[in-house]
Amino acid sequence: MANKKTLTPTSLPASLTLPEERKAEKALLFGLLASRKSLPEIAFRIRPEMFTHPDIALAIEAYLSLHGKGEGTDILSVEKEIRRLSPERAGQLPDLFELARQDGYMEVGGEFVRQHCQYIREAFVARRLILRCHELAHK
């Protein structure tokens, strides 16, 4: 059975690799940090469960929560919303800028956010399709 939040089934063969876009996830987060104007363009296109990196998924959940309430999405507001949404994880998360730059990923500005969003959506749909096929094949 798949975990709805991360879409990781417990019985998935080790030889099967699910598609993911970790660099695009980090670039999208960095783009949102760099330009708050990017969020309204993509808010209706993304959901936290589309992200494979759990810390980035939580940050996106915070961004979308604030956006949905019509509140500002500056870094302090996002970090405060993360603490509200997940107090048990909030203290364990790295700084949002560090999270976006982990693994030495090159910084990307807000102008590419829409394209990175598309990469993330495509990988999410592919993961769901693979997992559903796997589930049906093993019923």
List each model region and its residues.
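Noncatalytic partner-interaction/assembly domains of nucleic-acid and motor enzyme complexes
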Residues: A2-A123
